[in-house]
Curated annotation (Swiss-Prot):
One of its GO terms (cellular component) is Holliday junction helicase complex. It comes from the Bacteria. One of its GO terms (biological process) is DNA repair. The gene is ruvA. This is Holliday junction branch migration complex subunit RuvA. Keywords: Cytoplasm, DNA damage, DNA recombination, DNA repair, DNA-binding. Residues 141-150 are annotated as: Flexible linker. GO terms for molecular function: ATP binding; four-way junction DNA binding; four-way junction helicase activity. Disruption phenotype: RecD2 is synthetically lethal with ruvAB. The keyword DNA repair applies. It is found in: Cytoplasm. It comes from Bacillus subtilis (strain 168).
Length: 201
């Protein structure tokens, strides 16, 4: 198995590149060939696809792209050309996010992906990409956690403002604030109700 090819880009076509290494030119199908420039030095991470009638190399600029490509090949109805089209048409992080969020509308935008195939991609890959592209998954979920935290902080701030409007002094509000901070994920109304329960005791 060829893990990667490091060499000089000899030729760029709409479907593939040719990279020269040790006097040998490797034809490699890539998602976006025109990101490469002829005579530039590149490292291409490769996947060797073997069929009875053909031996083909598919190449990617990162190991993460390659890993996502191999995962897509495991989906019923997705072949090398389909997986390559998905990677070529969208950012890998956006593809992963669409899978995790079950966003069929996003996935059907890719060439050759209908509703049935989009649903199959989600069924086969949701929750199974963390070990393949951990950095992308980590960034995705960290982003979601940050949004949740920001939403909770906003709800708490709105609740405190509501208490001020109701006429409660800062001293009283500060007394119940530690109790409110212990509560996670409440809405503004729920925070207000919790505060009033403490204040009216």
């Amino acid at each position: 198995m060829i893990e990667f090819v490091k060499g000089t880009i000899d030729y760029v076509s709409p479907q593939y590149i040719v990279i020269e290494n040790g006097g040998i030119g490797y034809q490699i199908f890539t998602p976006n060939p025109f990101i490469y420039k002829e005579r530039s030095q590149e490292t291409i991470f490769t996947y060797h696809h073997i069929r009875e009638d053909a031996f083909s190399l598919y190449g990617f600029s990162t190991r993460e792209e390659k890993a996502l490509f191999t995962k897509l090949l495991n989906v019923t109805g997705i072949g090398p050309k389909g997986a390559l089209a998905i990677l070529g048409s969208g950012d890998p992080g956006a593809v992963i996010q669409a899978i995790e969020n079950e966003d069929e509308a996003f996935l059907v935008k890719f060439p050759g992906v209908g509703k049935k195939t989009a649903r199959q991609i989600i069924l086969d890959l949701k929750g199974k990409l963390a070990d393949v592209v951990p950095e992308m998954i980590e960034n995705l979920f960290n982003h979601e956690e940050r949004l949740e935290k920001q939403t909770a902080e906003t709800a708490l701030e709105e609740a405190l403002e509501a208490l001020r409007v109701l006429g409660y002094a800062e001293k009283e509000i500060k007394k119940v604030l530690p109790h409110l901070k212990e509560e996670i994920g409440l809405t503004t109304d729920q925070y207000v109700k919790k505060a009033l329960q403490k204040l009216l005791k």
